[in-house]
Each structure stands twice: as C-alpha cells, then as structure tokens.
Amino acid sequence: MNSENTQIVAALYKFVKLPDFAQKRDPLLSYCQAQGVKGTILLAQEGINGTIAGSRQAIDSVLWFLRSDPRLADLEYKESYTETPPFERMKVRLKSEIVTLGLPEIDPTEKVGTYVSPQEWNDLICDPEVTVIDTRNDYEVNIGTFQGAENPQTGSFREFPDYVVHNLDPTKHKKVALFCTGGIRCEKASSFMLAQGFAEVYHLKGGILKYLEEVPAQESLWQGECFVFDERVAVSHGLEEGSYELCFCCGYPISEEDKISPKYEQGISCAYCFDSLTEEKRARQQEKWRHYQTQVANSKNRDVS
C-alpha cells in the first residue's frame, strides 16, 4: 500500500521498570495528538504496551519521542498497513499491568522463556515432544490458530494460570511452546510457567503478527486469520486485512458464513448472542442500531457538505 491514504499501524510493547509512568502520560498524549496519531497506549510500572496508527511521518515521530527515554531506546514494534483509519481517537491509560495476568509477582524482566524466531517456529511446533499452547482468549482462537495447538478456552488472560495449574504438569510436559498475537502475553505466560517449574518454555518472538509478516503462506502452519484489537478485526498472511467483522451487539468476530445463520440480523444479533437476547434486550438493541445508523448518516452528510 503506497497511497496517500495509507495508515501505518504500529503495535509496540516493552517490559521495563517505569516508576515514573504516571508522569509520562500527559506529555505522551499531547505529542501523539499533535502528530495526528490515534490508538491506545497503556503505561504501567512494568512497562508500555499499545497499538497506534497514523501517517508514516507521524508514527516515526512518536517512536522517536518514545525512544528518547533511554529505558525505551530499544523499543521494538510490528508494522502493518490499512487504508481505513482503525482508531477513532488517541488514549493513553495508566494501568497496574500492561497485560493483565493478575499476578504482580510475575516479572518478565527477571525471568522469561526462550524466544523462537518465526523462521524456526515450524520446526519447534512439529516436534512431537513439544506441547503447543495458544495463550489467547477463546474467541480469538476460534478464528485462527497454529496447526496442532491446544486451546485453553479462556475468557481472559487472567484465567491462564488456572489452566496451567489444572491441565499441565512440569514432569510430563517438559517442552512447551507458547504463542499470542504480538508476543506480550507470552512474556508473562512463559515467566509464570518457569516459576511453576516447567523446564523448557519457548515462545514465538514477535507473535503471530511477525510470523504472518515473515513466513510465506506456502510454508505457513497457521490456519485461519489472526484477531487484532482494532477496526480491522483480523489479518491474514502478509498482514492483509481479513474477512471478519464484529457483531454490533456482542462484539464477537463473525465471518461471512456466520451471517448465513438464521440467528444473524445485522446490528441486532448473531449466532453467538441470539439465545441470550430477551425481548427487552432485543428492543434496546434495535434502538441502539437505529441510533448508530443515524450517526453514520449524519457523519457522511457533514463530509459531503
């Protein structure tokens, strides 16, 4: 994509001690807004995590601003492209964790698993002695995952430690390979598993996004699409925009095939939320959808005038 409308989408994170993280919020927000960058950045004592979008010059400027702090000088990011702005505004939030596991004693800056490059990943997960685990939430796994990977069926990352405790055994699962969207969840997951006594814990460096960017489709062991937390909903090989969209009612990712279901009604319900909708909830949702359509129509009229 090289058109003037192309947006650079930059996903970034780094675990690093930032005791002054609260003081960084306002200057960072002001700088991002001045560059016209939109998205969300989380700041916590344990580091930084976020996804932002903007022009090439704007993204480069924000990265320069972040890296001007010596603690973030080696901040890495993953880049993809879109013609449609994926965010509506810029937010910088202060959090207790940049990815919520709920175990503050787990510190990836002190102990973390072994990084595996996208080019080496296929060989690792094809090893019959390796247990491959998708650390993402169930709704993410359902639209795409690696061949042979286990799905912990978690509703949030906070549930991952319980999954490990009740389903895995350090004496039986001697080699474990973890993966997630961009790598951040695996940092904490691998740190936690090492603390639980697992001897060999590997994780995909750069996450699924880096794998889809660097590994040719014909060599890939990835099946489906990768859920992303912005307006694109999902991406495929080469980080091309995928085919999913979010149900307006429940926010679950739905495919074109899902829309064939008799339980799907645009703006009202999908197969994943239909059975939970009472008549009262359905009426509220219909009103919400009508209000949304009016907002969209008014916005288009303003753009034309």
Curated annotation (Swiss-Prot):
<keyword id="KW-0560">Oxidoreductase</keyword>
<dbReference type="GO" id="GO:0016705">
    <property type="term" value="F:oxidoreductase activity, acting on paired donors, with incorporation or reduction of molecular oxygen"/>
</dbReference>
<dbReference type="Pfam" id="PF00581">
    <property type="entry name" value="Rhodanese"/>
</dbReference>
<dbReference type="Pfam" id="PF17773">
    <property type="entry name" value="UPF0176_N"/>
</dbReference>
<dbReference type="InterPro" id="IPR040503">
    <property type="entry name" value="TRHO_N"/>
</dbReference>
<keyword id="KW-0819">tRNA processing</keyword>
<dbReference type="GO" id="GO:0006400">
    <property type="term" value="P:tRNA modification"/>
</dbReference>
<dbReference type="InterPro" id="IPR036873">
    <property type="entry name" value="Rhodanese-like_dom_sf"/>
</dbReference>
<feature type="domain" description="Rhodanese">
    <location>
        <begin position="126"/>
        <end position="220"/>
    </location>
</feature>
<dbReference type="InterPro" id="IPR001763">
    <property type="entry name" value="Rhodanese-like_dom"/>
</dbReference>
<feature type="active site" description="Cysteine persulfide intermediate">
    <location>
        <position position="180"/>
    </location>
</feature>
<protein>
    <recommendedName>
        <fullName>tRNA uridine(34) hydroxylase</fullName>
        <ecNumber>1.14.-.-</ecNumber>
    </recommendedName>
</protein>
<comment type="similarity">
    <text>Belongs to the TrhO family.</text>
</comment>
<dbReference type="InterPro" id="IPR020936">
    <property type="entry name" value="TrhO"/>
</dbReference>
<comment type="function">
    <text>Catalyzes oxygen-dependent 5-hydroxyuridine (ho5U) modification at position 34 in tRNAs.</text>
</comment>
